[in-house]
Amino acid sequence: MNQLAKLFDRIIGKVNISLREFNFDAAQYLKYLQDYIPLRQLIKFYAFYGVTGQQPFNFHFSRSNLAGSYFLGNCKVDNAILYKSDIRGDELKSKGDTINYQGVDFTLDLDEKVRIQDSILVKTLVHNCSNDPANPELFLIKNAASTPYANIHGSLVEGCFLGPFATADLTRLHGCILGTYAYVQTGELWKQHVANGRIWIRNNNRFEFSYRFPPKVLDRYIHFKIGQQPSGIFIDFIRKRKEHFQRIFDAVNLEPPAMVPKSTSLSRYAVVRPKTQIGENVLVAQRAYLENAFLGNGANAQENCYIINSRLAGNNVTAHGAKLVHTRLAKNVFVGFNAFLRGTADCPLDIGKGSIVMPHTVIDLRQPVAIPADHLVWGYIQKPNDLKYHTLSLKKLAAVRRQKTIKTMKFRGNGAAFVQSFRHRIQHILEANGAYFDGKRHRGHAQQDQNISFNIIQPYMMGPKKGLFPTLDIQP
């Protein structure tokens, strides 16, 4: 057994110890990895890191495999297997920044760092910054395993397992299991098993939103069982377009498309297919896919987003993993993590100005659907009649003071606080992305991420360390 195989077993053991209360065996769920990602895959792909003149960076890699993964910012990785994952540290806090927690101000003494230890991340996005008030300078992922297309967004993850397309958003997780396509934004969870397809948002005692997909519906879109690879419509959709990414990762230098404005950032690791138009102050992240897409001024496409035969009018947030097909978004529409919005040429989807599509929403149309302006959208929609059970005007939601139940969607608490919280966050995302850049002020990712220098690193190709990457310290 070489050192990489021993590393795999070591990580599995640590995850299992952390989840022993659930009688959970990560090895059974991750057994497919040894077929899905055999050793030849782990030595086939290089890792790469980005350097800018504006983003602090300090990389440390030891006793790890980093095949196909991307790093930006301050990152420390020890005893880990990261396969085609994105560790994007462009929103980490800097030395001297001040944060406020429950009325108390803290000033950071150090630049914040992402630390990944004793973990397996497969096609996983890590982004944002630590939301742990006890450790504001450390974004920690430890003794954890995540499966394809999970998102770890501003979330401490310690001793956890994340299923396919699961999202941990602004939540500190300790000894938890996030089921397939589960989404949590709850502040903190200890020793909880969040069911497959559950969308759960909680803000202390102010409000709580909860919805769960019917299991039969969810299984068609993403299915994950012991010893099997993830399968379903989501996987088929991605696999169908996989070959287009191969060229951009194989090429050393690629000329950017001529139509990119100076105030826009288009990653050289994004796919841009014919008939695509990109406006000003737009951010297109690595592993995004655009085909016959119109992105108006201030729009964005984050990691693992697919925008096909669709039009975004402007100032649209398309969060990590969202997919839009034959969809028209009016201005200021928010589409959440891993949402799947698929119309057709005969059955397009229109979403009105200012509407909020909740994370992990599935709209897969059999008839044309038009969602009015300023509505909240969730759940599973195929035809216009579904809207009465899966949408609610933001005005009506803001009027809720105690609770609101619509079929399996349950909301309790202050509706106005919920709407205000979402509006505030969307505004922050647009500002961070540089949507409001006027040529001098309000710079963001769209302007700051334009001149990234990419550098590649490769693993040992033979011997007992085959598949491991050399220990590296990379400093300014």
State where each predicted segment sits:
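Transmembrane alpha-helical segments and their membrane-interface loop/helix boundaries
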Residues: 447, 452, 464-467, 471-476
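Extracellular beta-rich repeat passengers
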Residues: 43-44, 49-67, 71-72, 76-81, ...
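Extended low-complexity, polyampholyte segments enriched in Ser/Thr/Pro and acidic residues
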Residues: 2-19, 30, 35-53
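Eukaryote-specific, low-hydrophobicity, charge-rich regions
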Residues: 46-47, 55-61, 240, 244-266, ...
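Beta-propeller domains
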Residues: 261-292, 296-298, 302-303
